[in-house]
Amino acid sequence: PLNNIYLVATSAMDLFRAIDGIDSIRLSGTQENGWYIQEAKDAMESGKMIYAGKYNAPDYELILDEGCGLAIESTMIHHNPEVEEKLEQFGIPVMVERSSYESHPLGRTEWMKLYAVLLGKEDVAEKAFKEQTDKLDKVLTSDDKDTGKTVAFFYINSTGAVNVRKNGDYVSNMIELAGGKYVPEDTGESDNALSTMNMQMEEFYAKAKDADYIIYNSTIDGELSTIDELLAKS
């Protein structure tokens, strides 16, 4: 089983948590205050996990000193191929995490099975994955699975534009699977690697103002506590 993993792909942390594998991660590409997963924050606070630089500026000396067995990168590494080459020159294998390309939520979840193979935790992953599929089956077979409720999921970027998910993206799929209806409806399919698109506030408001629920994507832009904070961004 692998140890002293350098985890740069943040989306993989929750999958490692699900298979009780966080102890195998020694090096983080995200600082403590950037983690929303409590187990990761706790590991960094205790010193079990340490910051080793982000994807485009890793601390090579630290990574080597810690005996890193594998670097798990996000697709952002393709913007800095020299980093991947340097890690491999040092004898550190690099894996690019591509779960974000999965359009179905269970497709993303199933990546835990890959990490389980690396850690020798296949049985744990099979059990955890079945728990998730059972939960989804329960929803899909429910008599009232179609709620008719509309849901908007978005954040406002630094230019004031509204970033929304495209139809067919895993977030919009999760909303549909849960019995909701994603709005705006006409955001197009994910016909390329980008699963999001920007639209002007006026257009977004016209299409989403009657949504039953609005979900602000705080993982990108930070949390909002009040409606006034949201209005200030617009």
Language model: regions and residue ranges:
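Short beta-strand and adjacent tight-turn residues that come in two discontinuous sequence segments
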Residues: 27, 73, 97, 185, ...
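Extracytoplasmic substrate-binding proteins
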Residues: 48, 61, 65-72, 78-161
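Sec-exported extracytoplasmic/periplasmic mature domains
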Residues: 7-10, 17-21, 65-68, 88-92, ...
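Solvent-exposed loop/turn segments at secondary-structure junctions
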Residues: 5, 11-14, 31-34, 58, ...
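Flexible, glycine-rich surface segments
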Residues: 141-228
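A short, structured surface patch at a secondary-structure boundary
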Residues: 1-64, 70-76
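Solvent-exposed, acidic/flexible segments
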Residues: 8-9, 18, 53-57, 76-80, ...
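A short, gly/pro- and small-residue-rich
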Residues: 21-25, 83-98, 224-234
